């Protein structure tokens, strides 16, 4: 029987997923080392059983990675280069993602890591994927090309307080009684609650049968983005009207959304561009490997709203930037 890794390297601990995963791993007794960029500071918002080790490195600089990998059994790869303050800053993210993934894999191989668990995105390669989704899949291929057993989880829209997708949904529906949206809002997706994502990430670490696999993760509902907005409106008791127009390009949509939400245009643009791709699970093996009580879209929204009401102090540090009014 394969032993469960105990010493875990966590990348992206200041992010929406990473901050929650840090707490979950700590509660289950794993020893966690957080990889933090040289320009960042890890702020822990929730009480932990043991203080995580913090190691500073830059994935674009291979020479900074060996000390971070030393003594680790497994690693979570939760980083991506999307997220510049402007669309121009974001356009070069695919090349940065490739460099980061190659450097990380090389360092992991040299350090003798047994496993990597990567959270990427859904979408079929034949569907003319957006640059964002194509980059996430390319990163998975790079990580799975090496000697370290890499599990790639592919998710669609992740619903959680502070996350870009949920905050876009929240601000648009709260602020706009009438919405003019591109026709892509009719594209189907399979949203998943952030709580379920964390359960799958931890479950992969405990379940050796997931090693080396690519697994789709999604919630129980397959719905359009229009339906997501209407579900949010119903939960909040709001009356909203949505009209589609054929002329809104992703770039124009991103600039418009940036005016009414606090989410930077550099994050909005790749998310909006990806609306044209249907992102639903084609493979449900993970439901047998890691049984999880999946939350509905309505339940995920209710949980996210409850967490939002608690304020940024209850959330990982980077999320606070999406919660300003």
Task: Provide a role label for each language-model segment.
Residues 84, 122-133, 158-163:
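Conserved catalytic-site region of short-chain dehydrogenase/reductase
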Residues 100, 135, 164-165, 184-205, ...:
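Substrate-positioning beta->alpha
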Residues 39-111, 122-125:
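NAD(P)H-binding glycine-rich loop region in Rossmannoid oxidoreductase-like domains
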Residues 120, 141-162, 168-171, 175, ...:
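Conserved beta-loop-beta element that borders a ligand/cofactor-binding pocket
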Residues 30-37:
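Conserved glycine-rich Rossmann-like NAD(P)H-binding loop of the short-chain dehydrogenase/reductase
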Residues 11, 35, 78, 116-122, ...:
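SDR active-site strand-loop-helix element
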Residues 2-5, 203-267, 278-325:
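Mid/C-terminal beta-alpha module of Rossmann-like enzyme folds, strongest
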Residues 2-30:
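N-terminal Rossmann NAD(P)H-binding glycine-rich loop of SDR-like oxidoreductase domains
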């Amino acid at each position: 029987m394969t032993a469960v890794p105990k010493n875990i390297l966590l990348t992206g601990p200041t992010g929406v997923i990473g901050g929650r995963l840090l707490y979950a791993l700590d509660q289950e007794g794993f020893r966690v080392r957080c990889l933090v960029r040289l320009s960042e500071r890890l702020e822990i918002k929730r009480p932990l059983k043991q203080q995580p080790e913090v190691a500073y490195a830059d994935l674009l600089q291979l020479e900074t990675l060996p000390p971070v990998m030393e003594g680790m059994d497994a690693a979570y790869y939760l980083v991506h280069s999307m997220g510049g303050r402007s669309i121009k800053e974001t356009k070069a993210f695919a090349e940065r993602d490739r460099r980061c993934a190659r450097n990380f894999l090389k360092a992991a191989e040299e350090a003798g890591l047994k496993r990597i668990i990567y959270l990427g995105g859904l979408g079929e390669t034949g569907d003319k994927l957006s640059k964002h989704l194509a980059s996430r899949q390319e990163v998975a291929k790079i990580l799975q090309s090496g000697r370290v057993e890499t599990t790639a989880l592919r998710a669609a829209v992740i619903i959680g307080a502070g996350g870009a997708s949920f905050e876009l949904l929240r601000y648009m529906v709260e602020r706009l009684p009438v919405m003019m949206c591109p026709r892509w809002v009719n594209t189907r997706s399979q949203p998943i609650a952030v709580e379920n994502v964390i359960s799958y990430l931890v479950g992969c670490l405990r379940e050796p049968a997931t090693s080396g696999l690519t697994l789709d993760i999604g919630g129980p509902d397959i719905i359009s983005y229009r339906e997501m907005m209407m579900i949010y409106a119903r939960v909040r008791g709001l009356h909203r009207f949505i009209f589609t127009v054929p002329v809104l390009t992703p770039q124009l949509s991103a600039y418009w959304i940036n005016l009414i939400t606090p989410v930077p245009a550099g994050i909005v643009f790749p998310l909006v561009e990806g609306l044209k791709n249907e992102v639903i699970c084609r493979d449900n093996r993970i439901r047998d490997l890691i049984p999880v009580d999946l939350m509905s879209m309505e339940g995920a929204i209710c949980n996210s709203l409850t967490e939002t009401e608690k304020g940024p102090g209850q959330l990982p540090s980077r999320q606070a930037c999406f919660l300003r009014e």
